[in-house]
Amino acid sequence: MTSYHSHPPKAYRRFESVCTQAPNAIAVVHEGKPVTYQQLQTQVLERSEALIRQGLADHPYMPLMANRCLEYLITMLACCKLGITYVSIEPSTPSKRLIAVLEQLGCNHLLLLGQPTDLRPDPTLTCFRLDDCGTLCSDGPALRQPIRRRLDDASVITVMFTSGTTGVPKGVRISQDGLLNLVDNVQQQVQGKPRSYVHHSSIGFDAALFEVWVPLLTGACVTLQPSEFNIDALDHCVRAASCDVLLLTTSLFHLVAQHRLSMLEAVRVLYVGGEVLKPVHARALLLANPRITLVNGYGPTENTVFSTWYSLNKPEDAERDVIPIGQFLHQVHGKIVDAKLQEVEVGTPGELLLTGANLALGYLDEALTPTRFLQLPEGTYYRTGDYVIQDEHGMLFYQGRIDEQVKIKGFRVEIAEVEHALTQLPGVAQAVVQAHVMNDLENSLHAFIVFRHGSPTIEESKLMSLLGDRLPHYMVPRRIHYLAELPLTANGKVDKRSLQPPEKAAVVSPQAGSAVLEIWSGILGTRNLQLEHSIYGYGASSLSVVMAHSRINEILGRTTPFDEVARLSTFQEWVQYYATHADPVTSLRSQHGNH
């Protein structure tokens, strides 16, 4: 048996230092219960010994399928102490994608935390759980022999999987140094004093690195928001925690700026990132909360969450057509190049290459690493695939993507991976996927497919179900459109500009539901809706539900609880729900009459 705990890595030594300096400070709040740094460290040491006893410390990777819970943080820190690279996996991950991830990791084991006791993602896996006494136990086949460690494995703190162009998710090897540099930059920006953070992002999303590691390595407190996305629950959590440092995806921030600005009253530093920040929403926040600093961040997972950022401190900072993505973090560097990798002049757009302390140590699949991590004379650079432009003051401005990568619900999606998954479905010969604007906050994916000649046509709902077994929810297209053949340009290439989602057939809606349907139509970008259909079949997301709930309540003058409408799935259910609470048609007409 091999033990790695006698020489813990840098990140864990930083955690130990915090525990020594402030043992009685609150480290974590979970379900209303505070845990001090001393208590947390004690549990981490116990978990480390449990991992060693089970033989897990001999393996370079520890896949964790977990909710946002205390046991997850304890295990994450224990892995860090032992030099094991932890891999966070969402419980909603489709089984085929889970197996693909584990195959890349070279292991057949999985640690389940905060899960139902009867959950078994796949019968071929060795599943570890905590019993009622907190003892780590396992079931299933024996562990595989540990795979050989790479020379730099000890420098990797976690692997985060992102969408891949080959149809297989890419594992990004995040380094200890990159994580610590992110922590140091944030600590300097928030002026060093202990703060209150909230962890609400998906554990498999790189934002979780910020939400968890920054507070735990700086002596701050992190409150765990355990439930699935629920705007009321997040609002309550942020307020109850007196959260003063918060990270939101840009799309979620835009939603909060429109409907829940009061949620951010106590926040002093708000980080946003993942998509283009709209000046109108930035200005609304800065007007409502003069004491807040809004940080517009930019960065791929391959460069550890944030590579550049731009701070806005007053409404005037947002009075511009485009908000910059700012300047490089300390010890992060980059250059803007043309197609031949030659640096361009100031004011000329080009592709951004990144290097420096935040740089990941390549991909888990070593064959993929040289396709994006370039060995240049001055060192290793990551090709972002992002067009940027730099002004004479050194400010960077995002200009768009070079390839077909898009952001859906804040997640990075490679169009090629979705198209590949579609062509693996029975009878599908060709597939083209495009992102279309759904409303002012969201994009959605539409798929256009051609079946092989003679193959039976499979219903859209069945195809959606099959895709859901292969892809995470945010990568499943909103709609699948059937074509006899794909349109071609004069050059014989697919004419993607002519592929537009068709309007649905008109619906005759009852008068009582016209207000609800009018609002949903605006959100989904579709004029005609079928009452009996699911809102999610039209591409609705959790953000869409928040928007609909807020707008309908605003029109009706109601304060209906979010958790009640979050359970509604069809348009008919929405109509019936609001018909029992108010007369939406009368209220809507009344409001329109006042304009």
Swiss-Prot record:
Pfam families: AMP-binding, AMP-binding_C, PP-binding. InterPro entries: ACP-like_sf (IPR036736), AMP-bd_C (IPR025110), AMP-bd_C_sf (IPR045851), AMP-binding_CS (IPR020845), AMP-dep_synth/lig_dom (IPR000873), ANL_N_sf (IPR042099), PP-bd_ACP (IPR009081). Its cofactor is pantetheine 4'-phosphate. It comes from the Bacteria. Homodimer. The didomain protein contains an adenylation domain (A domain) and a thiolation domain (T domain). Involved in the biosynthesis of the phytotoxin coronatine (COR) which mimics the plant hormone jasmonic acid isoleucine and promotes opening of stomata for bacterial entry, bacterial growth in the apoplast, systemic susceptibility, and disease symptoms. CmaA catalyzes the adenylation of L-allo-isoleucine (via the A domain) and the attachment of L-allo-isoleucine to the 4'-phosphopantetheine arm located within the T domain of CmaA. It can also use L-isoleucine, L-leucine and L-valine as substrates. Belongs to the ATP-dependent AMP-binding enzyme family. This is L-allo-isoleucine:holo-[CmaA peptidyl-carrier protein] ligase.
